[in-house]
């Protein structure tokens, strides 16, 4: 006979646990009572990791450094050197080489790449398609699908023998649809002599991933979209066309595909289109134009702006822009996308007296909030419906993060001869003598804001990574970075679970990557 477990021995619902103690969470996981599916188990593990990282005695120690003559890239536990030719894994205690691709001439080097994570909700026909891959664009117009772990070529597509595609990979819908665009077409000398107008601005190809499938290739014609059109991009199913007059127009890409696609093309199959025959995606045929836009699609949205373009996001939908007038320089306007109405308190102005401008963007945590950051202040803003009026909105400050400033001490300096001199001018907000914010990142798995602040000591910039709670803004931890921070060179900092990666451009146009790993003190043994 099998005895039924008593009610006390049954697994409690995962959502009812309130303990924040890491030891208790580890014990619950060991006993199997923390969750009944992988998603909840992962969330529990990340909660434990967050608690460990934020402990006072937890440190981050530099474990590895490597220099490069070309730009260094990082994404999802992988560090790429030499134009994506060499890949190192940062998931181990020290980074190790995952793969190294054969050297190629400059005409075949990788110029851009996207990391494609494997889909969890779909089972694909081929096992190789179920794993993460690196999508690369080479200088000779080849699109390669490489294994993210071995560098093995899984698939390749030739784009065009007529148009040059360069440094132009981007996500339309993240991990679902991507696009690649050609460089802008310029009128040749022969065309000018013959009086022929070249109205083709560029070509844009859209693909689906997992498995790799062609959506279509389209031409951006100035006769259709306007003579002032200068650039395009795809994002969230919207084709955005920018104009030299600081105007942006948005069009539905789904509408364009449904109305103007003349034929659905399949990679690797024979095709006869536009008076040419070949295999789609093979050289020299490439990918022909199968989306022929002969009339302007309906405009979903248009806006003129002063600088930095237009951003769309938030809950409900809003957009951020700077009106196209000099008097609005330095301000950011938050407006409803429904009717264009400016939100109450929607004009955000840092009033920064600094060399570097402030920056603003929608929070990547999908909360609909806005991050507005300057050299001394970071404001986290919320879009709220006005009291008693559901169709009008106002911008309120959720919380602010401020840098430590001593205005009195900053007015007096001591010269090399020992004389005390009082400043005759006000210090800039990003003066090297003061603590200054340089960047703000969001660690989604740990729900932490990572803020880089810079201070100066002994004529060298010293950087620290501050970890703030994403919900309250409370400062949880400071992590010093060992290498000096020279503001005249470009820097990038990534915070990914238990790893901090700092890439920096150094003198002589060389680059260096520094990797820090979480370290706990050794437990006392009896």
UniProtKB/Swiss-Prot annotation:
Keywords of this entry: Membrane, Nucleus, Transmembrane, Transmembrane helix, Ubl conjugation pathway
Q: In which pathway does it act?
A: Protein modification; protein ubiquitination
Q: How does it sit in the membrane?
A: Multi-pass membrane protein
Q: Which GO terms describe its cellular component?
A: Cul4-RING E3 ubiquitin ligase complex; membrane; nucleolus
From what superkingdom does this record's organism come? Answer: Eukaryota
Under InterPro entries, the record lists: DCAF17
TM region positions: 200-220, 237-257
Give the subcellular location: Membrane; Nucleus, Nucleolus
Which GO BP terms sit in this record?
Answer: protein ubiquitination
Pfam families reported for this sequence:
DCAF17 (PF15802)
Q: Which PANTHER family match?
A: DDB1- AND CUL4-ASSOCIATED FACTOR 17
What is this protein for, i.e. what is its function?
May function as a substrate receptor for CUL4-DDB1 E3 ubiquitin-protein ligase complex.
- Stated name of the protein: DDB1- and CUL4-associated factor 17
Top-down, what is the taxonomic lineage of the species of origin? Eukaryota, Metazoa, Chordata, Craniata, Vertebrata
Which gene is this protein's source? Answer: dcaf17
């Amino acid at each position: 006979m099998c005895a039924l477990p008593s009610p006390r021995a049954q697994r409690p619902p995962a959502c009812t646990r309130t303990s924040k103690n890491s030891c208790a969470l580890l014990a619950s996981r060991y006993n199997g009572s923390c969750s009944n599916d992988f998603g909840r188990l992962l969330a529990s593990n990340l909660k434990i990791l967050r608690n460990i990282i934020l402990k006072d005695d937890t440190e981050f120690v530099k474990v590895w450094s490597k220099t490069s003559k070309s730009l260094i890239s990082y994404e999802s536990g992988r560090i790429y050197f030499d134009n994506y030719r060499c890949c190192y894994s940062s998931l181990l205690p020290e980074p190790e080489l995952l793969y190294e691709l054969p050297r190629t001439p400059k005409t075949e080097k990788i110029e851009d790449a996207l990391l494609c994570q494997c889909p969890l909700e779909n089972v694909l026909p081929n096992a190789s398609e179920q794993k993460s891959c690196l999508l690369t664009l080479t200088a000779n117009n080849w699109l390669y699908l490489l294994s993210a772990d071995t560098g093995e070529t899984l698939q390749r597509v030739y784009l065009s023998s007529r148009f040059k595609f360069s440094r132009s990979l981007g996500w339309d819908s993240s991990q679902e649809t991507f696009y690649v665009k050609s460089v802008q077409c310029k009128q040749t000398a022969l065309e000018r002599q013959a009086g022929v107008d070249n109205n083709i601005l560029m070509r844009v190809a859209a693909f689906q991933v997992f498995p790799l499938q062609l959506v279509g290739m389209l031409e951006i014609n100035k006769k259709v979209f306007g003579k002032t059109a200068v650039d395009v991009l795809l994002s969230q199913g919207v084709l955005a066309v920018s104009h030299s007059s600081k105007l942006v127009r948005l069009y539905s890409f789904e509408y364009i595909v449904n109305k103007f696609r003349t034929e659905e093309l399949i990679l690797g199959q024979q095709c006869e289109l536009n008076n040419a025959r070949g295999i789609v995606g093979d050289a020299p045929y490439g990918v022909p134009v199968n989306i022929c836009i002969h009339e302007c699609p309906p405009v979903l949205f248009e806006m003129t702006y002063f600088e930095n373009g237009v951003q769309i996001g938030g809950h409900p939908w809003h957009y951020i822009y700077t009106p196209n007038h000099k008097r609005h320089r330095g301000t950011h306007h938050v407006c409803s996308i429904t009717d264009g109405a400016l939100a109450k308190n929607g004009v955000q102005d840092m009033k920064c007296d600094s060399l570097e401008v402030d920056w603003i963007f929608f929070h990547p945590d999908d909360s609909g909030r806005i991050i507005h950051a300057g050299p001394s202040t970071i404001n986290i803003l919320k879009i709220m419906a006005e009291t008693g009026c559901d169709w009008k909105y106002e911008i309120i400050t959720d919380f602010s993060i401020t840098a430590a400033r001593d205005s009195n001490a900053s007015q007096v300096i001591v010269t090399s001869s020992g004389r005390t001199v009082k400043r005759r001018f006000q210090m800039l907000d990003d003066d090297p003598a003061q603590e200054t914010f340089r960047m703000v990142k969001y660690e989604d798995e740990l729900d932490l804001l990572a803020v880089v602040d810079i201070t100066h000591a002994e004529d060298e910039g010293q950087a620290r990574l501050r970890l703030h709670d994403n919900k309250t803004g409370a400062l949880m931890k400071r992590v010093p970075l060992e290498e000096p921070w020279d503001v005249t060179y470009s820097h990038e900092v990534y915070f990914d679970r238990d790893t901090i990666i700092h890439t920096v451009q150094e003198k002589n146009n060389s680059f260096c990557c520094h990797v820090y790993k979480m370290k706990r003190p050794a437990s006392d043994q009896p």
